Amino acid sequence: MIALPPQPDLDLASLVRTIPDFPRPGIQFRDITTLIGDAVGFAESVRRLSACAAAYRPDLIVAVEARGFLFGAAMATAMGLGVVPVRKAGKLPGVTIGVDYELEYGTDRLELHEGAVLPGHRVVLVDDLLATGGTILATAALMRSVGAEVAAALFVIDLPDLGGSARLGAAGLRCETLIAFNGD
């Protein structure tokens, strides 16, 4: 295994590709595949997220489908912790527990394996991007429903103009991000 040295001066935002008008006109899609495709950039992202997470002393990393899995699994490995995937309904085999949450037009459901997170576990939630905050708030509600303590939610990218970070703060959920893309 090759351990890449820390790159504290690396501009992670420069490694995120912006695709205009995707998936529809007027949207600036922030594509992390260019960040994770760069070994140094991905390693530095994981190092920074892990350092943030370590300050909260979690028992587990909880990773949100789907790109949160990439960062959550790497962080958990770096920190010597387990990682628990939270998935959309019907994606996990076996007995699951879940929470329904509101979308702009309808509802969705998130699930995890029963017993994967236990009462008293201190967890850090991880996803790649924070937009409106709905998915991470639902994930936090799911964790609390099993008696876990949600220490914080961590993201690679925040789109503050969409209100997610403010919404999380208003809900009392600590939030940290590595990159913020304002406007455009």
UniProtKB/Swiss-Prot annotation:
One GO molecular-function annotation for this sequence? AMP binding
CC terms in the record's Gene Ontology section:
cytoplasm
Gene3D superfamilies found in the cross-reference section: 3.40.50.2020
Family matches, as PROSITE patterns? PUR_PYR_PR_TRANSFER
Q: Which InterPro entries match?
A: Ade_phspho_trans, PRibTrfase_dom, PRTase-like, UPRTase/APRTase
Catalyzed reaction equations: AMP + diphosphate = 5-phospho-alpha-D-ribose 1-diphosphate + adenine
Provide the alphabetized UniProt keywords.
Answer: Cytoplasm, Glycosyltransferase, Purine salvage, Transferase
This chain's function reads:
Catalyzes a salvage reaction resulting in the formation of AMP, that is energically less costly than de novo synthesis.
Annotated family: Belongs to the purine/pyrimidine phosphoribosyltransferase family.
* Name of this protein: Adenine phosphoribosyltransferase
Q: Which organism is it from?
A: Sphingopyxis alaskensis (strain DSM 13593 / LMG 18877 / RB2256) (Sphingomonas alaskensis)
